[in-house]
Amino acid sequence: MSDSAYNPGQDGAKMGFADAMSYGDYLHLDALLDQQHCKSDAHDEMLFIIQHQTSELWMKLALHELQAAREALQQGQTAEMFKMLARVSRIFEQLNSAWDVLRTMTPADYTRFREALGPSSGFQSYQYRLIEYVLGNRNPNMLRPHEHVPEVHALLSAELARPSFYDEVNRYLFQTLDGHTENLPAPRLDAPHALDETIQERWLKVYGDIDTYWTLYELAEKLVDLEDYFRRWRFNHVTTVERVIGFKRGTGGTSGVQYLRRMLSVELFPELWTLRGDL
């Protein structure tokens, strides 16, 4: 065994980057790692910032996959769509794990910098709102917090003006089963998707004959899987907030834990959950 330190360059690894793109160059790490600006001298504020910044990065990827999945469905590329939906589920699994890190912050730790946050709040995350809009939970009232950023407001408004991903799924369902979409209920673009018996009847037909309708069955289960992880993320959000601030009002003026608990009752794909009791 040699006593000298291993030199990867001797095995052909490139060690100098004055003339080439490095890892840091490709990822723009100089800019990325310079975006954590604490407003206080509290030690745990850095954790709080990085927790939310990394969550936003994962949500950016989730949106990238969801938009591509919607396009793939419209083009009949179901295999590609399934891969994208599976990835979104894994993204929310990753986001769920991140709460474990934030839970190491105690209420006493949080109070040391909470005032520095002002009225900023996670419920103002436009990417989270866009994910909900894409999946079908559409509340036009939630546009208001983004009026001060015209391009963001326009992005969210544009999503509200088009069918959600679940609307496209149901269009595919009716087209496959009926051969047309004449009986497909018109989607409400400006309201959360509500349970519809006509849609549920079609899904029951799928679940009653999965061999014939395997692609639709697999699609439905991919959506249930996605919402399962999404619900867990919401639940972990509630328990983390309750653990850290109790039942105080949120920094954004919401009722805090009570507001988050209300969100737990929201179902993105209600027909796919309700039909389970009818099988």
From Swiss-Prot:
EC number, UniProt record? 1.13.11.11
InterPro entries recorded = Trp/Indoleamine_2_3_dOase-like, Trp_2_3_dOase
Similarity field: Belongs to the tryptophan 2,3-dioxygenase family.
What organism is the protein native to? Answer: Ruegeria sp. (strain TM1040)
Q: Which GO terms describe its molecular function?
A: heme binding; metal ion binding; tryptophan 2,3-dioxygenase activity
Sorted alphabetically, which keywords does the UniProt record give? Dioxygenase, Heme, Iron, Metal-binding, Oxidoreductase, Tryptophan catabolism
Primary role: Heme-dependent dioxygenase that catalyzes the oxidative cleavage of the L-tryptophan (L-Trp) pyrrole ring and converts L-tryptophan to N-formyl-L-kynurenine. Catalyzes the oxidative cleavage of the indole moiety.
Cofactor: binding comment: Binds 1 heme group per subunit.
Names of required cofactors: heme
Give the UniProt record's GO annotations in the biological process aspect. Answer: L-tryptophan catabolic process to acetyl-CoA; L-tryptophan catabolic process to kynurenine
Annotated positions binding heme: 237
Q: In which pathway does it act?
A: Amino-acid degradation; L-tryptophan degradation via kynurenine pathway; L-kynurenine from L-tryptophan: step 1/2
Which residues are recorded as binding substrate? 48-52, 110, 114, 251
The answer on whether this UniProt entry bears the keyword Secreted reads no
- The UniProt record lists the keyword Repeat: no
**Database matches in HAMAP family:** T23O
The entry's protein name is Tryptophan 2,3-dioxygenase
Subunit comment: Homotetramer.
Reactions listed under catalytic activity: L-tryptophan + O2 = N-formyl-L-kynurenine
